[in-house]
């Protein structure tokens, strides 16, 4: 198994609450995460223990995974444990106010389970690029909604 630990961040010209309203809503993930194809909310409340199943495509492979909320401190922190899928570990969303709005960080830390034969050095660059692209889409959505609202 390959160990992965990467963090990607961007600045978004919006409040943490405006960002979290999109970022912490699993139903909106396909809007800002191109890899995510479907979302099935198993437990609708945003609270520890709540589960969501997703399907996605990454590096030419279709797969699904289930996350469980470990911690939520709206609108600043959402920590998800990956309960099953091709990757086990934790995804953390962190939103902190900044001079220009908010700094948004996504951290993925864990191990591959289904891609164990592929070294981390081959997984991390496309994963980092995918997260960076997702944060760019999130930025466009949130800043666009802010202008409309």
Protein language model regions, located:
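Hydrophobic ligand-binding cavity/cleft-lining segments
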Residues: 1-47
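Generic C-terminal helix-cap and adjacent flexible tail
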Residues: 2-3, 16-17, 140-149
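Intrinsic-disorder/low-complexity, polar/charged segments enriched in Ser/Thr/Lys/Arg/Asp/Glu/Gln
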Residues: 3-11, 51-53, 64, 77, ...
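Hydrophobic/aromatic beta-strand elements that line small-molecule binding cavities or substrate pockets
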Residues: 8-10, 41, 65-71, 82, ...
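Beta-strand elements of well-folded, non-transmembrane domains
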Residues: 12-14, 58-60, 110-114
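A short, structured loop/turn motif at beta-sheet edges
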Residues: 13-17, 44-47, 70-75, 94-103
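Short beta-strand segments that buttress and anchor functional surface loops
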Residues: 52-57, 78-84
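Beta-strand/loop substructures that line and gate deep hydrophobic ligand-binding cavities in soluble
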Residues: 79-133, 138-140, 149
